[in-house]
C-alpha cells in the first residue's frame, strides 16, 4: 500500500500531515531526483495550481525543492488540472505538477502529478518518488541548480487545444448558457473559451479570493447553478469543480445531469456516428439504469473500481475511448489524456447541436434506478470503518434488504476523511430506509 499517494495524488488539510510546506519541499526535491536519474541534462517540470490561497506557499516549496535537485521549473499559475496535463505533453516537459484539492474546500490542498505524456503517474514512478522522499535532501552544486521561468502563453495554448476537440464548424451561437466555475481554476479560461465559440453566457463562480473555492458553487453545489439557469431562462447550465477536471450540468428546468447521464448522451451519439470504440467504462457506483440503457443500444459496458485512474486503466486495456464516473469525471481518450471538464462539456454540446436536441431530450432513453450517496465523517483512517464488526454486519443486512432489487456500497474515500455509503434500489422508499439504517450504524461507530 502506498504510504503517501492516494487515488488522486496527495491530499489533506493545509498545515497538517503531508500538506505542509516542509513536506512539499521534500516532495519537490524527491521528484527532481527521480527525474534526473540516468540523464545528463536538467529535467523540466511544469507547476500549475488552482485558486486556493495556500497554493502560493506550496508553489514556492515545490519550486525550491525541484531547483535544489537540479530541475528546471516552468510556473503556469492558476490553470485547470487537465490544462497542465496537456501543457506537460506539448511543452515537452518531463513531468507536470498540479497544486489542488479539486472539489474540497479552501483549507484542504493537494499535489497531483502527470507524466511527460500528460497521464497520471504509474505505480512504479510513485513508489520511486516515495523512496526518494525518505532519502536525504539534495542540493546540487550551484552551477547545476535548476532555473525558473513563467510561461506566458499557456491560456492561449489550452483554448486552442480545447477548440480543436470539436469540429471546426462547431458554434454555440444562439445558445444561452450558465457557466459555474466554482471560483476555481477555470474562472478565467472557461468564460473566455465559451464566449469565443459564440455562446450567450451568464458566468458565476468567477471571482476567486483564495478562500471561496467550491464555497456554495461548482459541481458539488448544483443548487446555485440550477437557480441561475431557471432565473435567466438559459438553455442549460455547466458546472466545473475547483480544478476543472469534473463537469456536471443542469437542463433548462434546473434538473441535475450527472456523469452517468453525460456518458449516456455521448455513448449513444458516438455509436451512431462511428466514433465510439471498444467498451464504455463506468465504475462500481455507476447507476444500473445506465448499464441497461447502453445494453439496449448494443453498447458494451464494464465497471472499474472507483477513481478516474482505474477508469483510464480499464479503457486502455479494453481499447475504449469513453468512460467516467457519476461525479463528473469523464474520459474522452480520443481527445484528451485525462479527465477534462471543459473538453467533456464541449463534446456534449457538440452532440446536442448536431442532433438538434435539448439536454433533456437527449436523455429520454435513459431511465435511472433511484440511487443516493451519503458521506459519513470518520475521524480516524476511513478504511478502518469497513472492518468494524458492527459495520460489516449492518452492510450484510442492507445488502439482504435490497437483494434482487438493488445494490449497496460502503467504501472509504480516497481523497477525504469520510466513508461513502451508496444505496440503489428499484423503490425509492426501500432505498432511503436502507441507506438511513446503514448510515446510522456507521455514524455510531465513528
Curated annotation (Swiss-Prot):
An annotated GO BP: UDP-N-acetylglucosamine biosynthetic process
Co-factor: note: Binds 1 Mg(2+) ion per subunit.
Top EC class of this enzyme: isomerase
Entry keyword annotation includes Zinc: no
Binding residues annotated for Mg(2+), in chain numbering: 102, 241, 243, 245
Signal sequence segment: none
Keyword Phosphoprotein belongs to the record: yes
Residues carrying Phosphoserine: 102
InterPro entries: A-D-PHexomutase_a/b/a-I (IPR005844), A-D-PHexomutase_a/b/a-I/II/III (IPR016055), A-D-PHexomutase_a/b/a-II (IPR005845), A-D-PHexomutase_a/b/a-III (IPR005846), A-D-PHexomutase_C (IPR005843), A-D-PHexomutase_C_sf (IPR036900), A-D-PHexomutase_CS (IPR016066), Alpha-D-phosphohexomutase_SF (IPR005841)
Entry's EC annotation: 5.4.2.10
Cofactors that this protein relies on: Mg(2+)
Alphabetical list of NCBIfam families matching this protein: glmM, PRK10887.1
PANTHER family (alphabetical): PHOSPHOGLUCOMUTASE (ALPHA-D-GLUCOSE-1,6-BISPHOSPHATE-DEPENDENT), PHOSPHOHEXOSE MUTASE
Full protein name: Phosphoglucosamine mutase
Source organism of the structure: Xylella fastidiosa (strain M12)
Amino acid at each position: 500500500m502506498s504510504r503517501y499517494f492516494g487515488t488522486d495524488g496527495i491530499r489533506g488539510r493545509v498545515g497538517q500531515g503531508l500538506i505542509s510546506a516542509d513536506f512539499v519541499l521534500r516532495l519537490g526535491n524527491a521528484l527532481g531526483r527521480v527525474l534526473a536519474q540516468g540523464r545528463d541534462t536538467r529535467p523540466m517540470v511544469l507547476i500549475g495550481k488552482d485558486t486556493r490561497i495556500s497554493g502560493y506557499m506550496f508553489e514556492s516549496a515545490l519550486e525550491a525543492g525541484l531547483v535544489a535537485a537540479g530541475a528546471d521549473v516552468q510556473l503556469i499559475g492558476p490553470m485547470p488540472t487537465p490544462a497542465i496535463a496537456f501543457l506537460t505533453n506539448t511543452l515537452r516537459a518531463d513531468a507536470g505538477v498540479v497544486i489542488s484539492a479539486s472539489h474540497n474546500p479552501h483549507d484542504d490542498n493537494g499535489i497531483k502529478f502527470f507524466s511527460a505524456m500528460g497521464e497520471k503517474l504509474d505505480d512504479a514512478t510513485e513508489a520511486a518518488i516515495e523512496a526518494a522522499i525518505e532519502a536525504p535532501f539534495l542540493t546540487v552544486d550551484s552551477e547545476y541548480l535548476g532555473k525558473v521561468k513563467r510561461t506566458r502563453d499557456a491560456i492561449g495554448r489550452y483554448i486552442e487545444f480545447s477548440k480543436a476537440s470539436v469540429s471546426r464548424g462547431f458554434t454555440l451561437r444562439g445558445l444561452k448558457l450558465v457557466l459555474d466555475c466554482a471560483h476555481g481554476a477555470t474562472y478565467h479560461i472557461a468564460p473566455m473559451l465559451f464566449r469565443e465559440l459564440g455562446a450567450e453566457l451568464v458566468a458565476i463562480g468567477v471571482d476567486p479570493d483564495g478562500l471561496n473555492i467550491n464555497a456554495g458553487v461548482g459541481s458539488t453545489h448544483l443548487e446555485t447553478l440550477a437557480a441561475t439557469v431557471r432565473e435567466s431562462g438559459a438553455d442549460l447550465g455547466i458546472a466545473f469543480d475547483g480544478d476543472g477536471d469534473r463537469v456536471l450540468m443542469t437542463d433548462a428546468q434546473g434538473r441535475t445531469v450527472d456523469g452517468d447521464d453525460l456518458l449516456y448522451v455521448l455513448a449513444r451519439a458516438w455509436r451512431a456516428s462511428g466514433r465510439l470504440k471498444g467498451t464504455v467504462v463506468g465504475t462500481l457506483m455507476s447507476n444500473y439504469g445506465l448499464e441497461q440503457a447502453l445494453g439496449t443500444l448494443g453498447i458494451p459496458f464494464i465497471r472499474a473500481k472507483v477513481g478516474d485512474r482505474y477508469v483510464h486503466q480499464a479503457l486502455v486495456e479494453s481499447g475504449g475511448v469513453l468512460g467516467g464516473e457519476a461525479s463528473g469525471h469523464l474520459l474522452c481518450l480520443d481527445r484528451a489524456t485525462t479527465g477534462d471538464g471543459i473538453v467533456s462539456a464541449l463534446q456534449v454540446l457538440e452532440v446536442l447541436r448536431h442532433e438538434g436536441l435539448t439536454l433533456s431530450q437527449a436523455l429520454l432513453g435513459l431511465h435511472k434506478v433511484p440511487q443516493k450517496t451519503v458521506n459519513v465523517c470518520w475521524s480516524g483512517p476511513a478504511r478502518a470503518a469497513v472492518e468494524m464488526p458492527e459495520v460489516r454486519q449492518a452492510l450484510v443486512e442492507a445488502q439482504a434488504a435490497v437483494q434482487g432489487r438493488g445494490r449497496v456500497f460502503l467504501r472509504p474515500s480516497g481523497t477525504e476523511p469520510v466513508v461513502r455509503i451508496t444505496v440503489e434500489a428499484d423503490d425509492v422508499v426501500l432505498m432511503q430506509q436502507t441507506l438511513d439504517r446503514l448510515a446510522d450504524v456507521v455514524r455510531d461507530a465513528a
